[in-house]
Amino acid sequence: MAIHLIIFLRPEKGITLPQQYNHIVQAAIYNSIDTALATFLHQYGFTDGNRAFKMFAFSLLLGKYRINKEEKTITFEDEVQLTLSSPLGDFCQSLANTLLSRGTLKLGSTDVPVEKVYAQQFKVDKEEVHLKTLSPVVLYSTLLRPDGRKYTCYFQPGEPDYARLLNSNLKKKFKAFYGTEPTEEEVEVRPLGRQRMHLVNYKGTIIKGYAGRLHLSGPVELLQLAVDCGLGGKNAQGFGCVEVVNERKGTTP
């Protein structure tokens, strides 16, 4: 079953992390699922012949925080929420079981107590969906300069290439995960309100993404996959996690 896991963390004396913490959360996730599954996802993933997809996404850490600009750290002093999504039932179940039995999530060198874990299932049953990003969506192309050097061009909601790349990414994920060709129909994307640009330093690489609300319309199977495994690229690095707005169904594992 494809679900969203919402993990509630309760640091006893707060927790301080580097401002650029995506890789720390990513490592914590891999260290909290079945070893064989973690190895498969990390080393192989699901492929469409050219590109491999890990088939999970995670949000920013949400909670009250303060930033130390000099030390480039962020400190969470109270409850912290982390959301993950995946169409992989084994991934969700393994993560939930580990967190509930272990009782902690190891972020860097700190074992942070897990207060509770909620599960939510978002079922897309019509050809449109209103989404809120929980981590920035990244869509880009790698291009060549006249001298032959490569550079990365990032796109924002509203640009034609944004919609084109979003569709291409979704269809590649569909083929990689289900092993069948996706529909030729396209997903239309409409930004709702202001889209906030985020610059993230992931292990020395600067990545640009955009966060906000989006209205998607198109084939239900592609919309469902977008909700389940995230929008755009680099989902397993902490980008493109989304939730359905005003259409929640909640259960607790």
Identify the function of each model-found stretch.
Residues 1-253:
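RNA-interacting cores
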